[in-house]
Amino acid sequence: MNRKKANRIIVTAISCFMILFFITGCESKVKGPTDTLVSGTIYISVDESFKPVMEEQIRVFEKSFPLAHIIAAYKTEADCFKDLYNDSANRMVIVTRGLNDQEDVYFLDTLKYYPHWDNIANDAVTVIVNSKSNDTLFTLERLRDQLSGNTNREQKIVFDGLNATSTVRFVMDSILKGEKFDTSVVQAVKNSQQVIDYVAKTENAVGFVGISWVGNPEDSAQVKMLNNVKIVYVSCSLCEDKPFVKPMQASILTRRYPLVRGLYYVLKENYNGLGTGFVNFLNQERGQLIFRRAYLGTRMDFGVRRVKINQKL
């Protein structure tokens, strides 16, 4: 064998080795997950209605597991589902519903597995008024008439948007029974904080927010906000004596408060990654205690707090 031929064989062998090394390296990068139950970085989208309580959940989880990083984007429920569908980096959404049959089929076709989803807590859509208002007793019939523009047209109703939000969808489904509200009596703002700010500045206004924005007496910022707004009582239409009920854990868990909705996770993960670890945390005692402290109804059975209400009607 001459030197020229030997050199050609060596070059060919080196080239083959480099190609094999490159292919093997690429395959390992594609196949190997970069996160575990308690480490790594994932991106999630959260319904803005639950921002206060989910910020606390993430803070405590990351403090407990310093190698875990959950990057949350807070947006409308519709935009959360857009992320779930279209953003390959999105691992999970926190919203007010699970997947329907058509969505299950879609994700099975695209992901080749079903996403996991389940209820993790229950929320109350809370009606608030200005602190100077004496109008603190509402029936569902009255809310329906006002949203339809049939009564009290001078009282402005404010939402965190006119469409695409879970609160608007809930009100249309549960109070208006699928009908649309009268947009001339409804004011739209960008988010739940702006709903609270609007009601705090407008004496003749009614707002709708999730209970985690105003229900936590251990949150100094929320206690301060409640100097400017009041949580109203809504009649329990299914109760025999038709009492007016304030949203709190007991009335949420028993459904005596009529405006209760679920809080769900939907997870795109088919291995024991960080999304699964965070869901486990939300479902277990520490996560459920955080929901409880925010005055959501929990899945885990805790003793219900007895609360003395001193606020005048």
Locations of the language-model features?
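Short, solvent-exposed secondary-structure boundary motifs
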Residues: 6, 107-109, 187
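Short, conserved beta-strand segments within well-ordered enzyme catalytic domains
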Residues: 45, 71, 91-94
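Sec-dependent bacterial lipoprotein signal peptides
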Residues: 1-24
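Exported/periplasmic ABC-transporter solute-binding proteins
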Residues: 26-66, 73, 85, 118-123, ...
